Amino acid sequence: MIVKNGYVWNGTIFEKKNLYIENGRFVPYSDTGPVVDATGLFVMPGWVDSHAHIIGTGMKVLTHDLTKENLFDIFKKIRESSENFIIARGWESLPEQQILDKANELKIPVLLVRKCGHVAWINNYLKEKIGKRKDENNLLFEKEIEKVWNFLGDEFFSKAFEKGQEEFLRHGVTQVHSDDFHGVGFETLKKLLKNSKIRIFEKLYTYEPWNYEFREFGISKIGGIKLFADGSLGGRTAWMVYPYKDTGGFGMNTLPDNFDEVVKFSEQRHIQLNIHVIGDRALAEVLGRLEKNKVKLRHRLIHLQFVLKNDFPKLRNFYLSIQPHFYFEDIPLLDNVSFELAYPFLQMHKSGYMIAFSTDSPVSPADPKYVLEYAFKMGFTREDAVYYYTEAGSKIAGYQCGKIDIGYCADFALYDNDPFEENPVAVFVNGEEVMRR
């Protein structure tokens, strides 16, 4: 393939040049294959989202978005629709009791998921279906929510996967480090990965990794193990050193009982751990446990919103998936917590740590421009921000992608306007066109 006359991002500026592609990679020269006329178009490496949820992003498209819809309207229309399971996501504070009472009157399952995805409310009908007692709370926290996903079925998850892919590709994202193993069957997940248009590094959420395959599936691979050390800040389940001012609680420790066993397995098999840590107490616990296990691999930590000063230097030994926009989204929540370091992402950059940007979609939009806007506000330069959203993310997954250069994966996008303001007109993954607007 030849991509002719495009303005190609070289890491600093756009320069006019031709690109040559063979076997899914950029090569010095080729005169075979199709010719893509990129005259007047900008050519960017495909964005790499180092932490998101493809199925979750698709579910947001297929279900109700509480930032755009009203629950009363949703319940009112239910009699006129064929909907037999109401899933709505996006609440910050629990809906009023009057609305919850309305949900409890319905004889179909109702699941209302908080924006963060770590807390959910279920109606009485669904509570009975998953085996909770009548006198138990209708709120579900963390791993409890997994019981509900098992009701949805693989056909639904397959549709959600397709919608999620479309959403990322629409924004020029060609690689996602995804966390999808929630309810979907493993055989179905393997098929989805094998046939994916997008390059996926799957972080398999399991406490029993020895029961699963870690290998390549098409252009994608199951390459990491996903674990949670705590929950979310807004849900008051992030595990903190100092108590939450409104509840007096410290959050939740969600590390599995067999954490050390999983660590040893990952070290023996050379599989990357991907550990969700938001609170400073969660991070301190994880760092201590990994040190105790004398890990030799460079594992990955995700989020890192609060860090103890003594723990900050230890982060040099890990890959760090961060979300600059979370600081700005979480400002209303910060008065409720005490901390030493909060969202020290620019400090990580200045210290030379191995960081990569991500959206955590569907918690936040799947659009890289959204993340970049807040990265610039935080103080990152355009050049550094692009690097952390392309090549850096690819490196921490073991791929040679995210850069338009000889030997790199031919994952790129074409834009007819400023790539930092508009979506692409076409997207290519592994040298194949996968999206055209």
Q: Residue spans of the language-model regions?
A:
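Divalent metal-binding segments
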Residues: 2-4, 9-10, 14-22, 26, ...
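Short, small/polar residue-rich loop motifs at catalytic or cofactor-binding pockets
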Residues: 13-15, 220-221, 420-422
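Non-cysteine beta-strand/loop elements that form the S-adenosyl-L-methionine
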Residues: 53, 219-237, 318-327
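Acidic (Asp/Glu)-rich catalytic clusters
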Residues: 192-195, 214-220, 264-268, 294, ...
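Phosphate/diphosphate-binding loops
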Residues: 195-226, 298-305, 309-310, 333-347, ...
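His/Asp/Glu-enriched, well-ordered alpha-helical/loop segment
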Residues: 267-273, 288-299, 323-417, 428
